[in-house]
């Protein structure tokens, strides 16, 4: 069984888009720790949560696109985090930012305001005390820079 740092693994993932984002975050965390395990992580956590097909597919799409555009996402975050060296960004904060940017830039049909709110909630659940403010600040800077509608 996979365990996930920073949150309560026994807490069930809801069969919602929010739950799908949490699933994608957890799978990405495991992909960092054990490269090549993304699909197993997605399958295992989705099965444990009894998550519906459409939300599992959404989580998988988010995670795969996030990995596919990892370098570009890292560069965007690094450029926006003007007072932070990339090595100082907590692993989970970085993953939450990458996941949100994936949704903002590559997944159609989700309002930017919803994506940012969801990222802040993930940061509150899994990040440190100030993670939500950091995530909000970086996403705000990038959405303004990119001219994305909120």
Model-flagged regions — what are they?
Residues 1-126, 130-150:
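N-terminal interaction/assembly modules
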């Amino acid at each position: 069984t996979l365990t996930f740092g920073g949150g309560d693994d026994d807490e069930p993932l809801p069969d919602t888009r929010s739950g799908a984002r949490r699933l994608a975050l957890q799978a990405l965390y495991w992909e960092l720790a054990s490269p090549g395990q993304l699909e197993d992580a997605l399958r295992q956590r989705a099965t444990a949560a009894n998550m519906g097909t459409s939300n599992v597919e959404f989580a998988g799409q988010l995670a795969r696109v996030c990995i596919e555009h990892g370098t570009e996402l890292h560069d965007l975050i690094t450029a926006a985090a003007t007072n932070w060296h990339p090595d100082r960004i907590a692993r989970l904060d970085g993953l939450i930012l990458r996941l949100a940017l994936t949704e903002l830039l590559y997944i159609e049909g989700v309002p930017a305001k919803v994506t940012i709110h969801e990222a802040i909630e993930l940061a509150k659940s899994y990040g440190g005390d100030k993670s939500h403010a950091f995530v909000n600040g970086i996403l705000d800077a990038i959405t303004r820079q990119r001219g994305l509608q909120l």
